[in-house]
């Protein structure tokens, strides 16, 4: 039985990448922009109902809730060729339409005011599921809506559905994208640490570099960057939608990648990559070639993260024409050449999931691969944002903007709490590189979490 997943798209960025994700899923499942299954896809062996349900007229509708505090992006979606794909009852645009002004506090406060309306949408989707497995959140952590509203929504979903999994696709900012983004990011990372089970980190700097260096796009647009993100999102859900023997549900995916509860931030790599399949560069894509390329720094979608540190886990989702006998040989070659450095206290192995390709898309290459990896070097992106926050906080820079919102009008305790959680997260990823990690934090009575605490998903039946 398929285990359904509800997607929540929050803010400008969250809805933009969500839109591209649904376009990609429609193509891969043979669903047209109106939600009608094409004749050639009627007898498919895929699991469309993980992410879609069928309306009374049998057209497919995404299990999605679209949320924004300003109307521009959702209006564009509603005017696009995919306008009739979504359930209009699951779209929320704030009546004031003014956005959150890049202020986490405003986004968080606005979410609190309308929580009943949003939770009603989510409950309705959950009630329409036979076996709900979890939630996916798409958002950015730099601005106001994706960060603040997204943070509040994470907390409420976690409270409301304590045994359901929560995975996020979180876009981390380009430098100086928003002047107060160090504050917004710190406050968001606290919620991602305490309320999500798995966070796929999408680094805008790395995505832009990949578009420029690998795809030869001099000035990549938001649409082109979002297309890269949608490719990663679709590939990461392939085993759920085209199930095989392993990793065919959310629990299986996350359990294989998250060895300890708080270290659940993943980086990705994808190869071969192109925005237009007609112009895919001609190359030989063997299983070994794809596996090696996925470990190359230039293909990692978090800037500089793998230059130092060690892998805690790797799952490669390989699609295409693969001879299963080549899997062991290729893994042995990678091990012999020491292409991946693993932590000393865990299994030093790359997990491989062989997944089916959509029969409805001609990709232009025989084999493609997605790497989902838990690497201690991910702390570098947290450290940059944390240091920026500390610099701002020492000067109380722009703090008056936040003091005007309800959550900060009496005190700044929320900043202090977030500071501690993020610092502990950075410290834990550093500690995970050492053999004595299992004893880390035992002597610190003030620790907010225990690295040996069982993950939520270990208790799900």
UniProtKB/Swiss-Prot annotation:
Key words of the record: Cytoplasm, Cytoskeleton, GTP-binding, Microtubule, Nucleotide-binding
Location(s) in or outside the cell: Cytoplasm, Cytoskeleton, Microtubule organizing center, Centrosome
Native source species: Euplotes aediculatus
Protein name: Tubulin gamma chain
Residues holding GTP: 142-148
Major location (coarse): cytoplasm
Family according to the record: Belongs to the tubulin family.
Gene Ontology BP annotations: cytoplasmic microtubule organization; microtubule nucleation
Function: Tubulin is the major constituent of microtubules. The gamma chain is found at microtubule organizing centers (MTOC) such as the spindle poles or the centrosome, suggesting that it is involved in the minus-end nucleation of microtubule assembly.
Stored Pfam families: Tubulin (PF00091), Tubulin_C (PF03953)
Domain of life: Eukaryota
Molecular functions (GO terms): GTP binding
Cellular component terms per the entry's GO annotation: centrosome; cytoplasm; gamma-tubulin complex; microtubule
């Amino acid at each position: 039985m398929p285990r359904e997943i509800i997607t929540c798209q929050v803010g400008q960025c969250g809805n933009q990448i969500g839109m591209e994700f649904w376009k990609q899923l429609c193509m891969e499942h043979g669903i047209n922009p109106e939600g009608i299954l094409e004749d050639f896809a009627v007898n498919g062996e895929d699991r469309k109902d993980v992410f879609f349900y069928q309306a009374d007229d049998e057209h497919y509708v995404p299990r999605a809730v679209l949320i924004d505090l300003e109307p521009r992006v959702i209006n564009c979606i509603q005017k696009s060729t995919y306008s009739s794909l979504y359930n209009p009852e699951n779209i929320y645009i704030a009546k004031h339409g003014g956005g959150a002004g890049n202020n986490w506090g405003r986004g968080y406060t606005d979410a609190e005011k309308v929580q009943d309306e949003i939770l009603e949408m989510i409950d309705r989707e959950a009630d329409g599921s036979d076996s709900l497995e979890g939630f996916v959140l798409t958002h950015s952590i730099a601005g106001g809506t994706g960060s603040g509203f997204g943070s509040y929504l994470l907390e409420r979903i976690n409270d409301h559905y304590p045994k359901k999994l929560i995975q996020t696709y979180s876009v981390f900012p380009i430098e100086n994208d928003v002047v107060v983004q160090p504050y917004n990011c710190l406050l968001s990372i606290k919620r991602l640490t305490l309320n999500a089970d798995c966070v796929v980190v999408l680094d805008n700097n790395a995505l832009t570099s990949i578009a420029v260096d690998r795809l030869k796009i001099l000035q990549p647009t938001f649409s082109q960057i979002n297309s890269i993100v949608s490719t990663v999102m679709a590939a990461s859900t392939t085993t759920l939608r085209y199930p095989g023997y392993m990793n065919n549900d959310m629990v299986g995916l996350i359990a294989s990648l998250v060895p300890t509860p708080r270290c659940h931030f993943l980086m990705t790599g994808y190869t071969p990559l192109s925005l237009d399949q007609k112009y895919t560069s001609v190359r030989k894509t063997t299983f070994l070639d794809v596996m090696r390329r996925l470990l190359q720094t230039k293909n990692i979608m978090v800037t500089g993260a793998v230059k130092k540190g060690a892998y805690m886990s790797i799952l490669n989702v390989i699609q295409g024409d693969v001879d299963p006998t080549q899997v062991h040989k290729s893994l042995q070659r990678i091990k012999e050449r020491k292409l991946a450095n693993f932590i000393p206290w865990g299994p030093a192995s790359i997990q491989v999931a062989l997944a089916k390709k959509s029969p409805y898309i001609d990709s232009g290459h025989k084999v493609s691969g997605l790497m989902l990896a838990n690497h201690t070097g991910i702390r570098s992106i947290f450290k940059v944002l944390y240091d920026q926050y500390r610099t701002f906080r020492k000067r109380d820079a722009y703090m008056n903007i936040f003091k005007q919102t309800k959550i900060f009008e009496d005190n700044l305790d929320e900043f202090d709490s977030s500071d501690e959680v993020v610092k502990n997260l950075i410290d834990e990823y550093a500690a995970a590189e050492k053999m004595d990690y299992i004893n880390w934090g035992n002597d610190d009575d003030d620790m907010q979490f225990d690295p040996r605490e069982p993950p939520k998903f270990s208790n799900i039946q």
